[in-house]
Amino acid sequence: MPASLFIVRATIADPAKRAAFDDWYRKDHLPWAVKAFGARKAWRCWSDTDPSWHIATYQFPDRAALDRGTTPEIMKPLVEDFDRVWPGIPRTREVMTMVEEIGAS
């Protein structure tokens, strides 16, 4: 089974808020989300193309595990907490299936 990825992009338009957002996401949100989702692992990045974009990626062993981990019941408290702490921050969510992975030869 190919791995599935759940990708969340948040746009932090105000540069003055990015350090606080980064700290909160690292200490509070990411550990909670990984545990709640049952993700295999997670990582996050700030875009060099658009510095306002924060992208968090959660990896699951397969699509069924992703679907079990991101039900509305599991997502609701995470979304509510995000909206409470960071009101008005737009987000997008994507589900992707890995189709190929190669390493250097």
Go through each PLM region and give its residues.
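Macromolecular interaction modules
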Residues: M1-S105
